[in-house]
Amino acid sequence: MSNQKPVLYSYWRSSCSWRVRIALALKNVDYEYKTVDLLSEEAKSKLKEINPAAKVPTFVVDGQVITESLAIIEYLEETHPDVPLLPKDPIKRAHARAISLLVASGIQPLHNLKVLQLLNKKEAGFGGQFAKQFVVEGLTALEILLKQHSGKYAVGDDVTIADLSIPPLIYSANRFNLDLSPYPTVNRINETLADIPAFIAAHPDNQPDTGLNA
């Protein structure tokens, strides 16, 4: 195995990249951060040479390229098992994955930058309206699931893969000025996670490219 640091292609405000940054921090993985300006066609064109989808996060380890945030996190789980993000109990593990997928597949893609830009081209401001509707629907479902499965954290009393998606989702909701009072369980867990050093280190405000295109 190479001694070269793995490389994370990231953007400070990318929800998907944020999830991976949290996992890397929790597992104490030393890596190189490479900024991808998502508003730059040149930057995306260069990234496409590595990742055909030209998306972040893109993770390169030992010359191998891994794409998609949850696939990267699962890889880290298998290669750095000392800080587990998947519960041992199969049912809890399934719940943790389901919550993570709800956000990563059912909520986040509907308000990502590419979608908002496309919708706003058709009608000014429509992207924001569209995003708010689906974020609210997603938060409503997430609140119910967390009431069913949470302890101190999203699934039980240990941080799991499910928790990694909560801070980015709340961050996005705040950017859309959504009322978060209907989601007390989501808020409680988000506030608890905010005190964990790994979550602080992974926050958008603490990245090398913080403020780019702000």
Swiss-Prot record:
Q: Which residues form the GST N-terminal domain?
A: 4-84
Supply the EC number(s): 5.2.1.2
PROSITE patterns attached to this UniProt entry: GST_CTER (PS50405), GST_NTER (PS50404)
List the catalytic activities from the record: 4-maleylacetoacetate = 4-fumarylacetoacetate
Keyword Cell membrane in the entry? The reply is no
Q: Which InterPro entries match?
A: Glutathione-S-Trfase_C-like, Glutathione-S-Trfase_C_sf, Glutathione_S-Trfase, Glutathione_S-Trfase_N, GST_C, GST_Zeta, GST_Zeta_C, GST_Zeta_N
- GO CC, any one term: mitochondrion
Instruction: Please give the cofactor(s) recorded in the UniProt entry for this protein.
Output: glutathione
Where does the chain bind glutathione? S14, S15, C16, S17, W18, R19, V56, E68, S69, Q108, N112, L113, K114
Q: Which GO terms describe its biological process?
A: glutathione metabolic process; L-phenylalanine catabolic process; tyrosine catabolic process
Q: What top-level branch of life does the organism fall under?
A: Eukaryota
What family does this belong to? Answer: Belongs to the GST superfamily. Zeta family.
Q: What is this protein's name?
A: Probable maleylacetoacetate isomerase
Q: What species does this protein belong to?
A: Caenorhabditis elegans
